[in-house]
Each structure stands twice: as structure tokens, then as C-alpha cells.
């Protein structure tokens, strides 16, 4: 067994870490609380632009096809920063959710999830 992270996994993690250091500061989170708006739409849109939302979907389905290790590294960095947006829910549940739908509905849902107009929450 090989327990060493690949260069690609580490690069993905560092990209997320760098983004969060700039965009998910304690001040920005506190501002959301103060405004009673913990969900930051601009930050969500930026996460979509980075390909984070649905990143574990296959490339055929519009994702990056990242594996569970890279996904976990990404979510771990988001936890460190206190990111309030539902990225973990969106990414961990999307494949299982999409598997229960027929192809025609699945395609329409993928488009909505990838562009951020629909959210998965628990």
C-alpha cells in the first residue's frame, strides 16, 4: 500500500488552501454573521469557477474527476478555514444522488449543480 499523496493531490490542496486564505478570512465569516447572511454568494461563485463544486464528478459529467483522497484534502482545508458554504454536502452527496435518477433528469441536475443554481444540504 502506498500512503504518499500524489503531486496532483497536493497541488489541488494547495490551490484550495491559497484561495481560502484570501477569500475565507475570519473577518469575512464574521461579516456574514453580522449581516445575518452566512452564505457568501461571491465566494460560492468563485468556488464554482475553480471547479470545486462537483469536482469529484467524472469529467464526462462536467467534474474534474478527483479521487476521494483529493476530495478529502480539499474538505479538510475548508474545515481549517471555517468555510460556511455547503461544499462537503454538495460534493459528497452528488454522485449518490445522481445515481438514482434516469439519464435525462441526471443531465439537467448536473447542469444546475455545476453552475451553483441548486444546492444539496443535509
What is the meaning of each model-derived region?
Residues 9, 20, 74:
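Residue-level signal for inorganic ion chemistry
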Residues 24-122:
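Glycine-rich flavin
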